[in-house]
Amino acid sequence: MNKTYTLNNGVQIPAVGFGTYKAADGKSADVIKAAIGSGYRYFDTASFYGTETYLAEAIRQSGLPRKDFFIASKLWKTEMGYENARDAFRRTLENLETDYLDLYLIHWPLPEPGYENWKELDRETWRALEELYAEGKIRAIGLSNFLPHHIENILAGCTVRPAVDQIEYHPGYSQEAAVQYCKENGILVQAWSPIGRSRVLKDPLVCELAAKYRVSPAQICLKFAVQRGIVPLPKSSSPERMKQNMDLFSFEMEQEDIWRLATMPQSGWSGEHPDQERVYF
């Protein structure tokens, strides 16, 4: 699986990545090592995940050169602001045992719901990323969980346009307005939680399509992203499912089925929204 997309600055990015959130809950790099063994080369981490050092260990032990990997990380809500962002980036490089990142994102647009000066804070943070990009320390810069009104604020004052916006995206929560906005503005959408939750995997439509195409319900969810030009970032601790989650190019869904998935009633939402308190189910 060598399919890639070209970002708006010409950088090539793999079409599927591996999400490392909770990938080191056992305080070991074993899950990430298994993902490398399963063929993943694009890894998505974040300072908040606590997995940067485990990813570094797994890459070091793989024996593969750094250039074979596409490594993305994010700065957390408490690391926003110009100086904080530069400090956060330096810590991330140390944790990852590398001298550059392929992609660096602002994790959330607001440090907390209701934060009044978020526009200024976001622009200040973005300026730090632009400088790091200009210094050659990051190959591409982007956003995470930013909705159109947040992105507009960045675009109004940036010198480097965001290459990526990583949002929650899966059947039952496909954030169509945000996806459309990003596509119109040359921003590649990435999907976190691309499989949704167990409710999505058990959804009658998802199961019907899995039977129709002779794949797993998870593969239907991931293909839903891929077929719409969105990069899914699945995570799994099972080597068998890791491989399955990469096998997305041996089948194609009919357009009618894509529309059916896109118009499913809301299901499997994480409860997270950048402008509001988290909802717990």
Language model segments and positions:
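A short, structured active-site edge motif that brings together acidic residues
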Residues: 66-79, 103-109, 166-169
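CE4/NodB-like, metal-dependent polysaccharide N-deacetylase domain
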Residues: 85-106, 131-135
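Residues at the N-termini of beta-strands
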Residues: 42, 100-103, 140, 164
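N-terminal binding-site loop/beta-alpha segment at the start of enzyme catalytic domains
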Residues: 1-69, 196, 281
